């Protein structure tokens, strides 16, 4: 896949994330909560000024710097073909899209717009970019633990 295709894939994911957040700001904020599956899933507007577990409140530039470092690492890995398997490349693109989506919020709004609430467990409200990061990290862990190791052994 070419660098242009990588950029288009990330751009599409960021557009989806930002479109959902725009809807949340313009529509959901005035409503508050919309139950989708009562007792299971709802949409609840939240302006999140902290990271996971309420740490690093209002540390916008620390989050931005961390995201830039991660994005530089992803660009390096993709540009130098350090990651060969498609699942490894896809995982990095998904992580990049999530990082960019949340950085846009932090820089523009000084908070991240969250809206997805799982009601059946005690869990923080999250957004599409958070899903991208979690899914991307899970895919990368799978790649690293099972595929990367096999490819390395095959090269020996």
What are these regions (language model features)?
Residues 1-156:
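Alpha-helical transmembrane bundles and membrane-interface segments of multipass inner-membrane proteins
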